[in-house]
């Protein structure tokens, strides 16, 4: 059996793809990798929320899936829209890395909690900007785009004092020595899917290949958590462009999902938790999404989208 894998070209994307490829090879499956440029990689002077596409990092890979040029596409789960286009599905999730956000800097004495010292932090994530506004209002933010190495270089050249990034990406790139602060995911809640790698396929992929891929790659506990988080985001009709957040944890068969929504400045904050059996992951996520919408979330979403279009 041969599996053709599509991937973005960045170093982190290729690391994730090689991780998936190694899992397949260990089971005797022949593989090949096709690197693909996406609009999210090409348009670096515009914030993700303003590019105007939910699939900014996925559309080009999905085109290759639809054409039959590749069998699967490897993504950061956090980049995946909450609703996939017709004809595509997520067939596997890897064992999740630590989902926390970290502060990365070449200035080892940087203390984000010290409000007496001006600090500029690079991030283009609306969620991270909102969380900084809520918990660290003294911090100034600046948009920063590009792959991990590009962002680190921009920081060292003076664009900012530090960068706010996912621990998973920094760790996978071997840059742990640049971490100066790790944010607690219980308060600085990550986006849906952070730390997990997702495998996407055409719905037409042969059942034999799909089953073989799942057997090699899928991590059931991570999948359960991602199903809950993605159901929550789907109910909000959200993606990377809104400051929504959610984190599910599985203890035995008991699933706990915490999540919510913020205003762009972080001042308005809607948050709640739901729990239940892991087998009810999707229902738990939908229930939390309904709660958020019914308790000010619908009006807040309308306000956010109005601000983003003006």
From Swiss-Prot:
UniProt xrefs under SUPFAM superfamilies: Periplasmic binding protein-like II, Porphobilinogen deaminase (hydroxymethylbilane synthase), C-terminal domain
Pfam families: Porphobil_deam, Porphobil_deamC
Domain of life: Bacteria
GO terms under biological process: protoporphyrinogen IX biosynthetic process
Needed co-factor(s): dipyrromethane
Functional pathway: Porphyrin-containing compound metabolism; protoporphyrin-IX biosynthesis; coproporphyrinogen-III from 5-aminolevulinate: step 2/4
Catalytic activity as recorded in UniProt: 4 porphobilinogen + H2O = hydroxymethylbilane + 4 NH4(+)
GO cellular component: cytoplasm
Top enzyme category: transferase
Modification S-(dipyrrolylmethanemethyl)cysteine occurs at: 240
GO molecular function: hydroxymethylbilane synthase activity
Its EC number(s): 2.5.1.61
Annotated S-S bridges: none
Keyword annotations from UniProtKB, A to Z: Porphyrin biosynthesis, Transferase
UniProt remark on cofactor binding: Binds 1 dipyrromethane group covalently.
Misc remark: The porphobilinogen subunits are added to the dipyrromethane group.
Role, per record: Tetrapolymerization of the monopyrrole PBG into the hydroxymethylbilane pre-uroporphyrinogen in several discrete steps.
Matching PANTHER family: PORPHOBILINOGEN DEAMINASE (PTHR11557:SF0)
Known partners and oligomeric status: Monomer.
Family according to the record: Belongs to the HMBS family.
Name of the protein: Porphobilinogen deaminase
């Amino acid at each position: 059996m041969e599996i053709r894998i599509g991937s973005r070209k960045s170093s982190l994307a290729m690391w994730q793809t090689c991780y998936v490829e190694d899992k397949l090879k260990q089971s005797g499956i022949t593989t090949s990798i096709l690197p693909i440029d996406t609009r999210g990689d090409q348009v670096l002077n515009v914030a993700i929320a303003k590019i105007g596409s939910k699939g900014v990092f996925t559309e080009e890979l999905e085109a290759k899936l639809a054409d039959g040029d590749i069998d699967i596409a490897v993504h950061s789960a956090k980049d995946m829209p909450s609703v996939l286009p017709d004809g595509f599905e997520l067939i596997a999730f890897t064992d999740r890395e630590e989902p926390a956000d970290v502060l990365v800097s070449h200035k080892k004495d940087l203390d984000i909690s010290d409000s007496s010292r001006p600090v500029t932090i690079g991030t283009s994530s609306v969620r991270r900007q909102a969380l900084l506004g809520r918990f660290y209002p003294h911090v100034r933010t600046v948009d920063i785009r590009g792959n991990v190495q590009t962002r680190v270089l921009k920081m060292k050249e003076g664009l900012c004092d530090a960068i706010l990034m996912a621990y998973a990406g920094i760790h996978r790139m071997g840059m742990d020595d640049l971490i100066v602060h790790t944010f607690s995911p219980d308060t600085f809640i990550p986006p849906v899917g952070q730390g997990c790698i997702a495998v996407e396929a055409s719905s037409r992929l042969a059942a034999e290949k799909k089953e073989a891929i799942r057997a090699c790659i899928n991590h059931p506990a991570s999948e359960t958590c991602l199903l809950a988080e993605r159901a929550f985001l789907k109910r909000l009709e959200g993606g990377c462009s809104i400051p929504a957040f959610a984190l599910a944890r599985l203890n035995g068969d008991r699933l706990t999902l915490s999540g919510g929504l913020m205003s762009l400045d972080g001042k308005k904050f809607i948050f709640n938790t739901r729990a239940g059996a892991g087998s009810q992951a999707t229902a738990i996520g939908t229930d939390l999404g309904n709660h958020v919408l019914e308790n000010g979330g619908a009006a807040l979403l309308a306000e956010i989208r109005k601000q983003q279009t003006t």
